[in-house]
């Protein structure tokens, strides 16, 4: 069982933990401060998104499992990170000034998709090659037509 827990010295900064049902032990999987120790600076869009979702903490605030359960994907300070369960290694997938949001694994787990500056991107996890699928996000086309239907349609043809 995995869960988010605030640090003992800062309850508003969350780390990713695991509870082992067999051994009945808790252990930290990802220490958010080991990946990013500074003060998180949120974009206005991210502040609004967190406010709508009533999220008031920092650190790792959400995470997603790959379909086969072998990896986790999570945002931290606007960038995306990948954590492999077996190797226990985290790696930064993106490093930009803009925030990557709405990150998801592809069904096969070899790509991640996300939104940056209102455009859809896909990143190959192994090669870290990034492909920008849309270029008109600033014209409100994506916002008005809905991200999810467009993302599904685009990814089905791409992957």
Describe the residue ranges of each PLM region.
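Beta-propeller folds
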Residues: 1-159
